[in-house]
Regions:
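Src homology 3 (SH3)-mediated interaction modules
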Residues: 1-68
Length: 68
């Protein structure tokens, strides 16, 4: 059985430096796969640069990105 689900892909508009352990740093132009979009504006996702991914860091501010 194959399960398919939709993942939004966003591009970073600005650099962001994490301020808590759950967040991750990213740079302008980075691409992020979004896994959850709660209404508080702090989305969950994964940086699509395996060399810079950090386990346990998945939260980022939605106002720093745009949908592709």
């Amino acid at each position: 059985m194959t399960i398919l689900f939709s993942v939004d892909i966003v591009e970073a508009l600005y650099d962001y430096t994490a301020t808590i352990d759950e967040e991750f740093d990213f740079q302008t132009g980075d691409v992020i796969a979004v896994t959850a979009t709660p209404d508080d504006g702090w989305w969950s996702g994964e940086l699509l640069d395996e060399e810079r991914q950090e386990e346990g860091r998945h939260v980022f501010p939605s106002n720093f990105v745009r949908l592709f």
